[in-house]
């Protein structure tokens, strides 16, 4: 047997000590991770709602512009539906 290479009772420097100072480290890390994920979820939710409402508003404006053009051209909905049924354009 070579001296110095056997099992040692000295703790590894990278391992945490077992004791009261490291008792809550796991829960603290888990709480920070869950809180971070919750914040990211809220940010993406707010961004989705904002951009979706902006998209809906732009669609409303686009549709209102098309309706105004149709009114100016004298086209009404009934004639458009009949043309669609008869495949006349």
Swiss-Prot record:
Keywords: Chloroplast, Plastid. The gene is ycf70. One of its GO terms (cellular component) is plastid. InterPro entries: Ycf70-like. It is found in: Plastid, Chloroplast. Belongs to the ycf70 family. It holds the Pfam family Ycf70. This is Uncharacterized protein ycf70.
């Amino acid at each position: 047997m070579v001296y110095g290479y056997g099992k040692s009772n000295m703790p590894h420097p990278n391992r945490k000590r077992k004791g009261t100072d490291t008792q809550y480290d796991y829960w603290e890390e888990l709480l920070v991770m869950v809180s971070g994920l919750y914040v990211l979820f809220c940010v993406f939710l707010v961004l989705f709602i904002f951009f979706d409402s902006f998209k809906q508003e732009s669609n409303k404006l686009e549709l209102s512009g098309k309706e105004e053009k149709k009114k100016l051209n004298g086209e009404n909905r009934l004639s458009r539906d009949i043309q669609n049924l008869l495949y006349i354009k």
